[in-house]
């Protein structure tokens, strides 16, 4: 593939990759290793928002109902201790909550159904007024502690994947609509300037749910500021022991399940053009899929990020780290967790995909090239930066070549590349080669970390780039004019 860039191009490229990132349940933020992983991610990637389950689950201890005396009436109390600890940590790490209202406190729940190792209750409230009061009390407390102006910038999403029976009892659509109506009204009663949305559905019955949800909202004049849904790009997994092995959708069809949502939203005059937030996405939807830890995942996500912003206000990678307990505590550091970072502060290949996209944001002026294999931007100081990828989901071994010509002088340029592929940056392979230790020693972790960094190269060059990418490689490149300004008497390469 050959492309000549003139510098006058201006192509569509909405790089919203850093608006939000996912997390395991909120109570995990009380753990030391969780905070270390989030700091590691924030220092390099700097996400703006974080979204996860479990705000109202019992481990956060917010909703309390008890009797003070044998014959006394039950008293409802709210305990903000853990909530403040979590939010203070987020504030310190310069990340805001994308608030998900869920799951149900046990003493407010209408049933016993739970989900996950940590048993989040997924039944409707037995008293919708108490549920509304809980929402209002929580938001008012956050405003009191962090300030109205700040907290009003925190979006609010009602529940999580109610179209799945595990996440919402019987996947009862009408009951969810009631939950949404009550919840959204409660949010707006605190302050009309809060932004609230839903229905947070996943694939499968998503078309039916989104359409019916918007019809309900329209008919009942419910508050709605944005639409949310989730997106994963694999089929049902084949199970083997602790692991699931799903088949990836072809890269050309990675957004096929999403395409209908924009059309459904825009078919309603009152919702046309509404923001769509994809509040979860990844390749696989299970937390024990080895693909998450691989170079294939990095290349596949690189391809997705180049066009994800075309029709979506934001898209939240699920998740930033591997302190995560939906299926239980993992046995090994490379257990196929969702995270960008493996336990032990080991960046996975997909971490670098995000790091490369972050580099494109600095001094960004415009996009000058976007193809199925690369994206190139021009900066305000006339530097050209780009990312190229070679998604090979069937492991054919095919290589791709990329030849680019830039509107730069033909001499005195520097080319900087950072390469992530199965040979140069593959921490899972390092872990495999040293025997797949379930609990690696400090020295072993250090070795794996050393194998988890891109191969960085520099060279003097003309105004052309020739790049070869192996299977599932991702490469960041940067080319700019950089004349040599040697100190008096210094000659590079001279030793005598």
Role assignments for model-derived ranges:
Residues 409-465, 489-490:
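Acidic, Ser/Thr/Pro-rich beta/coil linker or hinge segments at domain junctions
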Residues 277-397:
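Aromatic/acidic polysaccharide-binding cleft in carbohydrate-active enzymes
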Residues 1-47, 471, 482-496:
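Mature N-terminal, pre-catalytic/accessory segment of carbohydrate-active enzymes
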Residues 7, 28-42, 141, 207-217, ...:
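Short, acidic/polar
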Residues 10-28, 32, 54-55, 161-162, ...:
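Cell-envelope and extracellular/periplasmic
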Residues 45-249, 286:
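Substrate-binding cleft and catalytic face of glycoside hydrolase catalytic domains
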Residues 37, 234-289, 311-322:
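Glycoside hydrolase catalytic-domain groove-lining segments
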Residues 371-433, 471-478, 483-486:
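Carbohydrate-binding surface patches
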């Amino acid at each position: 593939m050959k492309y000549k860039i003139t510098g006058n191009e201006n192509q569509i490229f909405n790089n919203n990759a850093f608006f939000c990132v996912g997390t395991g349940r909120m109570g995990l933020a009380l753990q030391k290793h969780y905070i270390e992983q989030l700091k590691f991610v924030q220092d390099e990637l700097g996400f703006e928002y974080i979204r996860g389950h479990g705000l109202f689950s019992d481990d956060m201890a917010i909703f309390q109902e008890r009797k003070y005396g044998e014959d006394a009436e039950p008293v409802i109390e709210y305990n903000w201790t853990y909530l403040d600890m979590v939010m203070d940590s987020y504030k310190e790490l310069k990340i805001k909550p994308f608030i998900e209202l869920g799951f149900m406190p046990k003493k407010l729940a209408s049933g016993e159904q739970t989900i996950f190792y940590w048993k989040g209750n997924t039944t409707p409230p037995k008293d919708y007024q108490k549920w509304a009061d809980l929402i209002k009390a929580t938001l008012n407390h956050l405003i009191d502690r962090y300030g109205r102006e700040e907290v009003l910038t925190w979006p609010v999403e009602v529940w999580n994947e109610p179209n799945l029976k595990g996440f919402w009892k019987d996947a009862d659509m009408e009951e969810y609509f009631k939950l949404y109506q009550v919840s959204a009204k409660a949010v707006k009663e605190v302050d009309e300037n809060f932004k609230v949305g839903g229905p947070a559905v996943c694939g499968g019955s998503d078309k039916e749910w989104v359409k019916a949800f918007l019809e309900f909202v329209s008919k009942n004049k419910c508050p709605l500021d944005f639409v949310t849904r989730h997106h994963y790009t694999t089929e049902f997994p084949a199970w083997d022991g602790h692991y699931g092995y799903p088949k990836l959708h072809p890269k050309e069809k990675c957004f096929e399940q999403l395409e209908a949502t924009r059309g459904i939203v825009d078919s309603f005059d009152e919702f046309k053009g509404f923001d769509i937030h994809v509040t979860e996405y990844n390749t696989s939807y299970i937390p024990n899929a080895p693909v998450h830890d691989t170079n294939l995942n990095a290349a596949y996500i690189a391809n997705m990020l180049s066009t994800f912003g075309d029709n979506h206000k934001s898209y939240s990678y699920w998740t930033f780290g591997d302190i995560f307990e939906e299926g239980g505590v993992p046995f090994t550091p490379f257990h196929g967790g969702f995270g960008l970072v493996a336990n032990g502060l080991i960046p996975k290949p997909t971490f670098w995909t995000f790091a490369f996209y972050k580099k494109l944001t600095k001094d960004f002026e415009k996009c000058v090239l976007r193809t199925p294999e690369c994206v190139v931007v021009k900066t305000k100081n006339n530097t050209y930066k780009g990312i190229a990828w070679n998604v090979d989901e069937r492991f054919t071994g095919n290589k791709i070549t990329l030849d680019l010509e830039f509107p730069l002088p033909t001499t005195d340029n520097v080319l900087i590349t950072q390469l992530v592929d199965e040979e140069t940056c593959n921490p899972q392979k390092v872990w495999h080669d040293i025997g797949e230790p379930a609990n690696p020693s400090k020295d072993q972790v250090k070795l794996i970390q050393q194998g988890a960094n891109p191969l960085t190269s520099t060279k003097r060059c003309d105004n052309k780039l020739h790049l070869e990418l192996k299977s599932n490689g991702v490469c960041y490149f940067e080319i700019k004019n950089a004349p040599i300004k040697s100190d008096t008497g210094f000659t590079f390469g001279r030793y005598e």
